[in-house]
């Protein structure tokens, strides 16, 4: 509830001044803390390119709306290929319990949960994520 209120109040201002927000650690924590467990561990340029910059890309709003409108959970059982699910234990956007549910519903899935990681494990723990992805893809060849 507090996060929703904060984003209603501060979100437009953060968006308007996003490059400055990213450069200042206390503002970066305030703006991205709800999504990324430790946003100050990420390089500012990477945070801009992969997170904030993506939010202003054409199509981002449409993609987010589609995600909200369409519940994919009932279709997870239709996935026939090996699937790697990577989740941050400290994800504040979609709780880790959802990952457990998705894993149970998805045949041939493998679930990896990263401790001390939030909503974007590929950015928060890139070395571990990339090694895991390399290993998963090599095993599936």
Per-range role (PLM):
Residues 92-98:
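Conserved alpha/beta-hydrolase "acid-adjacent" motif
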Residues 18-78:
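Conserved alpha/beta-hydrolase catalytic His-Asp/Glu region
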Residues 79, 85-87, 91:
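Short beta-strand/loop motif that positions the catalytic acidic residue
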């Amino acid at each position: 509830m507090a996060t929703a209120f904060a984003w209603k109040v501060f979100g437009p201002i953060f968006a308007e001044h996003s490059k400055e927000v990213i450069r200042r650690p206390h503002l970066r924590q305030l703006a991205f803390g709800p999504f990324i467990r430790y946003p100050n561990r990420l390089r500012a340029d990477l945070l801009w390119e992969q997170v904030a910059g993506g939010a202003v890309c054409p199509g981002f709003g449409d993609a987010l709306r589609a995600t909200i409108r369409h519940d994919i959970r009932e279709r997870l059982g239709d996935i026939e290929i090996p699937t790697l699910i990577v989740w941050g234990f400290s994800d504040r956007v979609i709780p880790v319990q959802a990952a457990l549910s998705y894993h149970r519903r998805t045949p041939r899935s493998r679930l990896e949960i990263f401790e001390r990681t939030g909503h974007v494990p590929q950015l928060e723990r890139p070395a571990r994520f990339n090694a895991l992805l390399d290993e998963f893809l090599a095993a599936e060849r």
